[in-house]
Amino acid sequence: MLRFAPSPTGDMHIGNLRVAIFNYIVSKQRKEDLVIRIEDTDKDRNIEGKDKEILDILNLFGIDYSVVMYQSENFRFHRAMALQLLQDKRAFNCFCSSDWLDKKREEAKNSKTAYRYDDACASLPDELVIDNEHPFTVRIRKPLEPIIIKDHIKGEIKFEPNDIDSFIIMRQDKTPMYNFACAVDDMLSDISLVIRGEDHVSNTPKQILIREALGYSKNIEYAHLPIILNDDGKKMSKRDDASSVKWLLEEGYLPSAIANYLILIGNKPPKEIFTIQEAIEWFSLENISKSPARFDINMLKHVNKEHLKILDAKELSRYVGFADAQIGEVAKIYLEEASTTKELRAKIALIFAEKNIPDEFKEYAQTIVKIIQKAPYFEEYEDFKNYIIQESGLKGKNFFKPLRILLMGSEHGPDIATVYKHIKNYLGEIVK
């Protein structure tokens, strides 16, 4: 069993989508189920409706899964496991106040040392714990031996005992901390491999420590993906528009192209343009670079254009707001100068929009409009053009410039003859 575990606290980040895609691919390769675990334990940060938005995006990208679960539904199991750790003396109640702990952190900061909890409550006698009426958290005891992770991407990572203190696993309100809930849920779901971002590397030894303390012996494999950098070489954040999957979709990037690009970067694929289903045949975690991947919007545009080219005319037509294959053919022509469905929509919209004719050509344009409205049907552009020239007496730029604007909505663009054969049935709507 593999899992994708997003939090419903904001728009889906491309890094999270990349994690979801990789989990999906590997689950198919291993013939194992994929579970979606909505990590909703941080009630203050949860945003209503974001869980549905996450699932809608996964469905849009063709990422199927066996079940959706909510971490908050497992609170009773988290509390039971915490009680077991307390009974086994693998955890202890901590009565240290927030003010006291903040003071200790400040002291560590001033002395330029890493803060580690000093185990002040680790050895309290049972009678003191029972009689104490102050609020408490639950901490798991720090490790005595090194914790070693064999990562599919990063190789061996070793954490010494001093790297991890006795950290909190249950809050004062009896809700689990992230690492505890995550470790317990991975046990409950029988997870075999965890694929996630490298920002979770420091969480992994803590989760291993929790499972070992609970007597869970199954080895869970790990693969931590390098972060994605922006143009400035910094980690992509919410300030970067392109970090939001929602933004990319609204800008007209196809799900298939976004997936293609996220698999492509920092990887060694056998070809540049492919689908997720094709990637299942050759994808390997071991081929993912250990170094951060840089996000290149121009490369994404290139990949997106190639995926748009693959679409048949009817399907492309739907992406630009029509249902006629002929409009899809026009969109294909405009792919010479456009890379997204948003750009294509704008190009097609100009054809059907009210035309903005320069003053010097308005009179000529009016003449052409009247002729077109009464003209017979012409299969070929040359016949259409010659008829208007003959009827209007116009020539040169006084003919071609207003005609182009009337038919295309712009003074520049593809060859009129190429476009005409696909819009000839719409002339009455185009030239109003």
UniProtKB/Swiss-Prot annotation:
It catalyses: tRNA(Glu) + L-glutamate + ATP = L-glutamyl-tRNA(Glu) + AMP + diphosphate. ATP binds at residue 238. Its EC number is 6.1.1.17. A motif ('KMSKS' region) lies at residues 235-239. A motif ('HIGH' region) lies at residues 6-16. It holds the Pfam family Anticodon_2. It comes from the Bacteria. It is an enzyme of class 6 (ligase). Its main location: cytoplasm. Catalyzes the attachment of glutamate to tRNA(Glu) in a two-step reaction: glutamate is first activated by ATP to form Glu-AMP and then transferred to the acceptor end of tRNA(Glu). Monomer. Belongs to the class-I aminoacyl-tRNA synthetase family. Glutamate--tRNA ligase type 1 subfamily. This is Glutamate--tRNA ligase 2. It comes from Sulfurimonas denitrificans (strain ATCC 33889 / DSM 1251).
